[in-house]
């Protein structure tokens, strides 16, 4: 079987289908199969050409194993059936270069494609040409909605983070403010504690100053009531009020303000003439009030041996304060009389630092109400002693009055070991020491009770006779007589005037007072009798101390 080469024939009429204007019915016919394969023998290789007049392009193709019969039938059948000229062939598989002979260059036409002016052709790749179904659209919508939700969640997260930062800053500011408030509170508390300590120190200084003995004592003349007395009244009243506040543990703020205003008015600067006019226009009531204000400063201290916390003196007392005194480990208790409303009598009770068995009771003031029989003796004795103490002048500096002094003999004509007048205390104080046993009286014969009816006038007219009668009185009646005599004698000292000229009355009675005092102090039996009476009175009430204390407190 001959080996030849075959060619691939392309019919150009297929290209004419796109351009119907180029179809030529003169030389060509339309075939159903535009691509025709024809076999070309190797002898006809030289005759191979490309026809420029035809519409076909021949491509020489070398085929092996093709039968000659099939080649002949194929070539003859194509040529016979179609009755047309075989177009030029192009051999793409030939080892030799094909020589293209162009016999008629003018008849060769090149196809020129015209551009299509249609613009509705979509040249893009449309992957969804079949249209989106509902499921596809829902998937797209779901994707878009999820993205929006993510964005919203991120925005909310950013907002929450900003709010958290703001809250953190506010919390930090609140912490700083709380720290500042705590520091301020601590500083204020420390300041308050320091102020309280300073106030306590000032109060202690005031108490120590009140208890400390004074170096110098200004003489006081209670008989001569003139402008000088009126000028010094404000100072005396202020000292008394301050001492009362110290004993009672302090008064209210309103009372302090009122006292300050009153003292400011009293101590306001005035001319001397105005002061003299005010003193001259003073009524006897003013003298009585001044005397009572001064009488409150006089104190009578009684020293007695007693195991009870308080001596039963017949009055009812209420404890309103207690404090520790300097130099004495035993506390000092303060009592006021509760038998009548507004009674000015006060007393202080304290154990002796050297001897705990000795109980010191200090009385101050006069009762303004009737007293029971059990309280008359002690009240009369203390009142008379205070009145006699304030009737003279204090000029002693060493704290002990001279036994030859008229005042010491007038108050209580006892020995210096029993009756003591302290001029160095903050206030004039009479101390009655009942801890020593007095000597027995020489004349102890009981006398009749008619001697108790002797009044003060007979005593003043007959001092020697009255002195002898007083020495013969029973011990239970002697304090009443002594107290009445001393109280009546104090009326002539210028403290309690009822009318008339004070200076004239004091001058007229001065000689009688001197005679009475001389008569009382002449006999030593009077001293022993007085001490025995007071001792018996104190010792007689010791067995009632427990009941009296429960009742009084």
Curated annotation (Swiss-Prot):
<keyword id="KW-0238">DNA-binding</keyword>
<dbReference type="GO" id="GO:0005634">
    <property type="term" value="C:nucleus"/>
</dbReference>
<dbReference type="GO" id="GO:0009873">
    <property type="term" value="P:ethylene-activated signaling pathway"/>
</dbReference>
<feature type="region of interest" description="Disordered">
    <location>
        <begin position="221"/>
        <end position="292"/>
    </location>
</feature>
<feature type="compositionally biased region" description="Basic and acidic residues">
    <location>
        <begin position="111"/>
        <end position="120"/>
    </location>
</feature>
<dbReference type="GO" id="GO:0000976">
    <property type="term" value="F:transcription cis-regulatory region binding"/>
</dbReference>
<keyword id="KW-0804">Transcription</keyword>
<feature type="compositionally biased region" description="Acidic residues">
    <location>
        <begin position="138"/>
        <end position="147"/>
    </location>
</feature>
<dbReference type="GO" id="GO:0080169">
    <property type="term" value="P:cellular response to boron-containing substance deprivation"/>
</dbReference>
<keyword id="KW-0678">Repressor</keyword>
<feature type="compositionally biased region" description="Polar residues">
    <location>
        <begin position="276"/>
        <end position="292"/>
    </location>
</feature>
<feature type="region of interest" description="Disordered">
    <location>
        <begin position="111"/>
        <end position="152"/>
    </location>
</feature>
<dbReference type="GO" id="GO:0003700">
    <property type="term" value="F:DNA-binding transcription factor activity"/>
</dbReference>
<feature type="compositionally biased region" description="Basic and acidic residues">
    <location>
        <begin position="254"/>
        <end position="275"/>
    </location>
</feature>
<keyword id="KW-0936">Ethylene signaling pathway</keyword>
<dbReference type="InterPro" id="IPR044810">
    <property type="entry name" value="WRKY_plant"/>
</dbReference>
<keyword id="KW-0539">Nucleus</keyword>
<dbReference type="GO" id="GO:0045892">
    <property type="term" value="P:negative regulation of DNA-templated transcription"/>
</dbReference>
<dbReference type="InterPro" id="IPR036576">
    <property type="entry name" value="WRKY_dom_sf"/>
</dbReference>
<feature type="compositionally biased region" description="Low complexity">
    <location>
        <begin position="122"/>
        <end position="133"/>
    </location>
</feature>
<dbReference type="Pfam" id="PF03106">
    <property type="entry name" value="WRKY"/>
</dbReference>
<keyword id="KW-0010">Activator</keyword>
<protein>
    <recommendedName>
        <fullName>WRKY transcription factor 6</fullName>
    </recommendedName>
</protein>
<feature type="DNA-binding region" description="WRKY">
    <location>
        <begin position="306"/>
        <end position="372"/>
    </location>
</feature>
<feature type="compositionally biased region" description="Low complexity">
    <location>
        <begin position="444"/>
        <end position="469"/>
    </location>
</feature>
<dbReference type="InterPro" id="IPR003657">
    <property type="entry name" value="WRKY_dom"/>
</dbReference>
<comment type="function">
    <text>Transcription factor involved in the control of processes related to senescence and pathogen defense. Interacts specifically with the W box (5'-(T)TGAC[CT]-3'), a frequently occurring elicitor-responsive cis-acting element. Activates the transcription of the SIRK gene and represses its own expression and that of the WRKY42 genes. Modulates phosphate homeostasis and Pi translocation by regulating PHO1 expression.</text>
</comment>
<comment type="similarity">
    <text>Belongs to the WRKY group II-b family.</text>
</comment>
<keyword id="KW-0805">Transcription regulation</keyword>
<dbReference type="GO" id="GO:0016036">
    <property type="term" value="P:cellular response to phosphate starvation"/>
</dbReference>
<feature type="region of interest" description="Disordered">
    <location>
        <begin position="431"/>
        <end position="477"/>
    </location>
</feature>
């Amino acid at each position: 079987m001959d080996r030849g080469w075959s060619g691939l024939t392309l019919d150009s009429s297929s290209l004419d289908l796109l351009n119907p204007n180029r179809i030529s019915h003169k030389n060509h016919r339309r075939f159903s199969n535009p691509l025709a394969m024809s076999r070309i023998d190797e002898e006809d290789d030289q005759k191979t050409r490309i026809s420029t007049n035809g519409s076909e392009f021949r491509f020489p193709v070398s085929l092996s194993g093709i039968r000659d019969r099939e080649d002949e039938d194929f070539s003859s059948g194509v040529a016979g059936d179609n009755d047309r000229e075989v177009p030029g062939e192009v051999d793409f598989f030939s080892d030799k270069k094909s020589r293209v002979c162009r016999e008629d260059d003018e008849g060769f036409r090149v196809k020129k494609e015209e551009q299509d002016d249609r613009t509705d052709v979509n040249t893009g790749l449309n992957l969804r040409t079949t249209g989106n179904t509902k499921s596809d659209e829902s998937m797209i919508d779901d994707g878009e909605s999820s993205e929006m939700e993510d964005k919203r969640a991120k925005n909310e997260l950013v907002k929450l983070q900003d709010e958290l930062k703001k809250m953190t800053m506010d919390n930090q500011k609140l912490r700083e403010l709380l720290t500042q408030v705590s520091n301020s509170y601590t500083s204020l508390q420390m300041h308050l504690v320091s102020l309280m300590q300073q106030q306590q120190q000032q109060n202690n200084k005031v108490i120590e100053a009140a208890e400390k003995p004074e170096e110098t004592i200004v003489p006081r003349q209670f008989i001569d009531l003139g402008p000088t007395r009126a000028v010094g009244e404000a100072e005396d009243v202020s000292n008394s009020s301050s001492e009362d506040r110290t004993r009672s543990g302090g008064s209210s703020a309103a009372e302090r303000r009122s006292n300050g205003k009153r003292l400011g008015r009293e101590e306001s600067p005035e001319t001397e003439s105005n002061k003299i006019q005010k003193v001259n226009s003073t009524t006897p009531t003013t003298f009585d009030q001044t005397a009572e204000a001064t009488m409150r400063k006089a104190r009578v201290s009684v020293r007695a041996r007693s195991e009870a916390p308080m001596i039963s003196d017949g009055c009812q007392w209420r404890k309103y304060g207690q404090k520790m005194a300097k130099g004495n480990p035993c506390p000092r208790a303060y009592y006021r009389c509760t038998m009548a409303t507004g009674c000015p009598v006060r007393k202080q009770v304290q154990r002796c630092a050297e001897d705990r068995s000795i109980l010191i009771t200090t009385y101050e003031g006069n009762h303004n109400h009737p007293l029971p029989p059990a309280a008359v003796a002690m009240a009369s004795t203390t009142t008379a002693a205070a009145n006699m103490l304030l009737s003279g002048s204090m000029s002693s500096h060493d704290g002990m009055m001279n036994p030859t002094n008229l005042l010491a003999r007038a108050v209580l004509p006892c020995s210096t070991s029993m009756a003591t007048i302290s001029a160095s205390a903050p206030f004039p104080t009479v101390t009655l020491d009942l801890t020593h046993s007095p000597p027995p009286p020489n004349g102890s014969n009981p006398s009749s009770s008619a001697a108790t009816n002797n009044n003060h006038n007979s005593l003043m007219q007959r001092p020697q006779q009255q002195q002898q009668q007083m020495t013969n009185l029973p011990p239970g009646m002697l304090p009443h007589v002594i107290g009445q005599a001393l109280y009546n004698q104090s009326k002539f000292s210028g403290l309690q005037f009822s009318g008339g000229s004070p200076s004239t009355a004091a001058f007229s009675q001065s000689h009688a007072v001197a005679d009475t005092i001389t008569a009382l102090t002449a006999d030593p039996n009077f001293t022993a009798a007085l001490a025995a009476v007071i001792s018996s009175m104190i010792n007689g009430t010791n067995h009632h101390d427990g009941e009296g204390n429960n009742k009084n407190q």
